[in-house]
């Protein structure tokens, strides 16, 4: 941003230029293998295993200079007084191993399960990995023989439930580290201060989720879903 010395925004500082640069790169490498099989036409199995890498890089640079010799040479390097220069760069990575298995019998009874292990650079080595899982089941009641009299108007009816554990990353990229910062202290003398205490106990936030649902359809035209979600944190 340019504060022109010929205007009220820049006349008292003889012109000012502020520059900011931000770069963000994200690389995701995902590999999955799935397998489906039907046994005796009534048993259906769907399996999956996978491996993922998430690599994110952020680079930030800023500068502000004032006192320019002429208004038409306003590159920040032409400012005679450097008011501020700052910048930082961060890189975070996460590696994940995952698997999933689903089974159903005659499209009537459903069972499922999943498991994954995630390792993140946002934690110190001993707490880097977290393991999470879920199980699920469903019953398509409309496929039962005793539901035959209702099929003229009730064309689908299914109840389902799932329970599982997932993890949440901390918002800080280096929250577990003890950090120090450079600063201009008394009489603008340089110094070092502690900006963050070391936290070896920082771990994955664990969330326990229970989901209950009821799906039904009327006359093959009206579809409805009733859903309940309960969550607990640790």
PLM regions: where:
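Extracellular/periplasmic, surface-exposed regions of secreted and cell-surface proteins
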Residues: 1, 11-230
């Amino acid at each position: 941003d340019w504060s022109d010395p010929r205007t009220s925004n820049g006349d008292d500082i003889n012109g000012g230029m502020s520059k900011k640069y931000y770069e963000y790169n994200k690389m995701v490498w995902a590999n999955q293998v799935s397998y489906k099989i039907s046994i005796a036409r009534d048993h259906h199995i769907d399996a999956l295993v996978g491996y993922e890498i998430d690599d994110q890089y952020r680079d930030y640079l800023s500068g502000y200079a004032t006192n320019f010799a002429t208004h038409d040479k306003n590159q920040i390097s032409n400012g005679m007084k450097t008011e501020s220069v700052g910048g930082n760069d961060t890189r975070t990575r996460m590696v994940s191993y995952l698997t999933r298995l689903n089974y159903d019998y005659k499209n009537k009874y459903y069972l499922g399960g999943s498991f994954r292990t995630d390792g993140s650079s946002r934690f110190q080595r001993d707490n880097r990995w977290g393991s999470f899982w879920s199980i699920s089941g469903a019953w398509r009641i409309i496929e039962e023989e005793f539901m035959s009299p209702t099929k003229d108007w009730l064309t689908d009816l299914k109840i389902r439930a799932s329970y599982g554990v997932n993890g949440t990353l901390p918002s800080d990229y280096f929250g577990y580290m003890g950090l120090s910062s450079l600063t201009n202290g008394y009489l603008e003398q340089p110094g070092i201060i502690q900006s963050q205490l070391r936290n070896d106990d920082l771990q994955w936030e664990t969330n326990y989720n229970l989901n209950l649902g009821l799906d039904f359809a009327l006359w093959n035209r009206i579809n409805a879903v009733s859903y309940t979600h309960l969550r607990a944190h640790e």
